[in-house]
Amino acid sequence: MFTASPMSLSKILARRDWENPGVTQWHRLPAHAPFNSWRDEASARADDNASRKRSLNGDWQFSYYAAPEQVPDSWVTEDCADAVTTPVPSNWQMQGFDTPIYTNDTYPIPVNPPFVPAENPTGCYSLTFEVDEQWLESGQTRIVFDGVNSAFYLWCNGKWMGYSQDSRLPAEFDLSAVLRPGTNRLAVLVLRWCDGSYLEDQDMWRMSGIFRDVSLLHKPHTHIADYHAVTELNADYDRAKLQVEVALAGEQFADCEVAVTLWRDGLSVATVSAKPGSAIIDERGNWAERLNVTLPVKDPALWSAETPELYRLTFALRDGQGEILDVEACDVGFRCVEISNGLLKVNGKPLLIRGVNRHEHHPENGQVMDEATMCRDIELMKQHNFNAVRCSHYPNHPLWYTLCDRYGLYVVDEANIETHGMVPMSRLADDPRWLPAMSERVTRMVLRDRNHPSIIIWSLGNESGHGANHDALYRWVKTTDPTRPVQYEGGGANTAATDIVCPMYARVDQDQPFEAVPKWSLKKWIGMPDETRPLILCEYAHAMGNSFGGFAKYWQAFRNHPRLQGGFVWDWVDQALTKKDDNGNAFWAYGGDFGDTPNDRQFCLNGLVFPDRTPHPALFEAQRAQQFFTFTLVSTSPLVIDVHSDYLFRQCDNEQLRWNIARDGEVLASGEVALTIAPQQTQRIEIDAPEFAAAAGEIWLNVDIVQTAATAWSPADHRCAWDQWQLPAPLYIAPPVEGTAKPDLKVKEDVLEVSHQSQRWHFDRASGNLTQWWNNGTATLLAPLSDNFTRAPLDNDIGVSEATRIDPNAWVERWKAAGMYNLTPRLLLCEGEQLAQAVTITTLHAWESNGKALFLSRKVWKIDRAGVLHGDVQVQVANDIPQPARIGLSCQLAQTPQTASWLGLGPDENYPDRKLAARQGRWTLPLDALHTAYIFPTDNGLRCDTRELTFDTHQMQGDFHFSLSRYSQQQLRDTSHHHLLEAEPGCWLNIDAFHMGVGGDDSWSPSVSPEFILQRREMRYAFSWRQD
């Protein structure tokens, strides 16, 4: 039995355990399945709060020091004079101590493993708690820390109890020897840096403290020490065996018996009792303290992410008189995970992984996760058709897995290992001195989490190269848990240490032949000789800011190539932290905003949702691409569609198809049909379409699938899938528009003035621009209508380029080098002509930089008898410059419209390579809703393929993209944070005939697909504009 140490604090610290990779713990108890230590079966079955598990969360005393050596020896027994109250769990950086540091892969400390800086911020926590004599005499008392970053020492009642590192797994200690009836005192010394920090180089905020739950756990003297349940299914999946192993501990275990019972809806399905003692396993005998039992189950309800059917399994330990000593319990899901014929399968069905990577992040609480936030994340994921989550890049809070079991998500559980900043990356993975530390991070994860049905894949970690340590750990996991595959991307994504080819940021059709670790195109990879494993991207579609272009291409490939089984989007939530400015106003901060160095700026903003879980527009693109129903227009006369269910296990029993036929947004007919589609089957639906009269406008069939009743993760009427098709319509001949008076041209010294009834247009003869437009005496322009060839750079345009490290290959650097952000117009022609029924103004501009013409823009403006301004624009692009971001026009309007209405793609922001989620229709939104508040400001708010646009007195027609914003492109370009943007007078209107895609395969290299780059060197467009 462990005896608490009387050594002083300074003597214990003098050993510098935190700089010894061979020391990962002192006196920490072995890993096991989570415990609650119920004392009756009913409570365990109901998962009620256990009276013998007491939370120690709450207010603790806290003192902060710059280094552990500064902590006085007396702190072990009494608080320091400067102690303050701090909440546990929390990160101390979020409580006003020390600095949070955001870096992607650069280590935040000098790289000299296993040594860390002498200046090593140290947090000293203390808490007093009460226990009575009966509690102490009736069993063992343990303390459980679910997460402490990065290493800590523990004292109780002045006695040193132990040490632990690995910030993302529990550390459990036996306090029994030092507890006393009445008041007891805990003291926890937490170090910011330890040698384990070299294994925790994940792309995240680097923070410290006791950031997960702390609890006291009371176990009887003889108790359950571990349990493990494995489900086995027959080939027809209608018979199951539940193989259960239970380990006991304590002096009297041999006299005890364990009743193992499987429950379903409160009823016992199967039960068996057994005494400890395993079968003989070798020449030395058996495990005396273990027992193995089998529970047969007929017609089991199978678990999947679609149908998260759960049973409850209880383990009741009884003494020789039949009295219950200890009860543990867990949820059980009957499911089989396997790889066969090159496919990852659950219950015999090949999966299509609709996955996302998720960091544990909260804008106010840092890395502290509460149940409400976890539930919200899962609900949003399921509402947007995700079925899988990767715990990037560490084991999560224990509750997360229980929620995934119950809501239904497939989980990749990942070890807390990343050495991204090492050179080479595999330096520690190939060093046997680091094998114990790496081993504990993998083995303890498996032993804690292996009972969860949601976990279908183990991951050995992230971006740590590939070394002999990985091979050893792979073999241990496969031996310990042969029921799950193992994945690991490091070393090229297809080493012998992975059952799944799991690259990150491989592209659909483009090879990236990096030296040593090439990334082949997805289609090529699965066809390579001797490669028979499934391919699932562990990271793809880097959703940084205004990004996610080309996501539909991935999903086309996934649906067309069975061994391309999906992937995990990077990533779920923008990792911004709430900070207050000098005026006390809160804003979302990113790398560098806390004075943290080194830092990687806004590279932490890669989420599909904002920090408060408000969706980015990209989330809707994922929802549409990943939807579980596909549609086919079979015929238009009669009007027939097929609806196919991609569900593998779910019978449609809560879905309804709602359809309407609309002309330019006006509904002509509608209806609804109940869906009764079996898994992977199709339902044919004939729609009673009316005869269409000849009229202006396009006719569209719109179909939505909605859930009629609320579910555990969605409200009633939640739309889970949709599609639309343009239908043939009778030819319509529009009558000519007749005006009452022809426009009049006046050639003045400085302007060409066109008048028509209550309207006047001024074309400046020096600039050639439309500088003012009066309507009923009101000036409508604050800045002239002028050519627009650039955009406020997106994160994907910037790539890794920054002031101290220019990437000449980044789009923004290529545009800068060509002079596109410093264009000067030179007017070559400006003339007006009075026609019989109209006035035309013709201009020709050369847009130059450093005396070189980059663009030629010829515009012919025509004002007709109806007072409509028609624009016909031809643009030539120089052959030796990079392709531009846009071809269009921009102006600043004098009025600020309250709303805008348009006929085109909407309602949400969409771009040419990210418009799968956009729907053709007529939409109306407030002006502010047309702006996307990306934390790092960029071009935003575009709506594509617009036929009509109406706001205030303005009406525009044509085929164009538009954005309306309170902020100019220049301000968006110059401003570092969204909260620093200042609304400008009026409103900025951008009309684009052509706009480059946003890209998104990754955010550090040009990733816009060729078809979404403006390759043509001559372009022409036209539109009309009128005011009422």
Swiss-Prot record:
Q: How is the cofactor bound?
A: Binds 2 magnesium ions per monomer. Can also use manganese and iron.
Q: How is its activity regulated?
A: Completely inhibited by Hg(2+), Cu(2+) Ag(2+), and partially inhibited by Zn(2+), imidazole and EDTA. Activated by Ca(2+), Co(2+), Ni(2+).
Q: Which InterPro entries match?
A: B-gal_small/dom_5 (IPR004199), Bact_Beta-galactosidase (IPR050347), Beta-gal/glucu_dom_sf (IPR036156), Gal_mutarotase_sf_dom (IPR011013), Galactose-bd-like_sf (IPR008979), GH-type_carb-bd (IPR014718), Glyco_hydro_2 (IPR006101), Glyco_hydro_2_AS (IPR023232)
pH and activity: Optimum pH is 7.5-8.0. Stable between 7.5-10.0.
Any GO BP annotation: lactose catabolic process
Which coenzymes or cofactors are required? Mg(2+); Mn(2+); Fe cation; Na(+)
PROSITE patterns documented for this protein: GLYCOSYL_HYDROL_F2_1, GLYCOSYL_HYDROL_F2_2
Temperature dependence comment: Optimum temperature is 37-40 degrees Celsius. Stable below 37 degrees Celsius.
Q: Report whether Secreted shows up as a keyword of the record.
A: no
* Marked site (Important for ensuring that an appropriate proportion of lactose is converted to allolactose) residue numbers: W1004
User: Which Pfam family would be a valid example here?
Assistant: Glyco_hydro_2_C
Give the top-rank taxon of the lineage listed in the UniProt record for this protein. Answer: Bacteria
Q: Per the record, where is site Transition state stabilizer?
A: H359, H393
Residues reported to bind Na(+): D203, F603, N606
Reaction equations catalysed: Hydrolysis of terminal non-reducing beta-D-galactose residues in beta-D-galactosides
Q: Which UniProt keywords apply?
A: Glycosidase, Hydrolase, Magnesium, Metal-binding, Sodium
EC numbers on record: 3.2.1.23
| Residues forming the catalytic site | E463 (proton donor), E539 (nucleophile)
Q: What is the protein's quaternary organization?
A: Homodimer.
Hey, which family's this protein in?
Answer: Belongs to the glycosyl hydrolase 2 family.
The name under which this protein is listed is Beta-galactosidase
Organism per entry = Enterobacter agglomerans
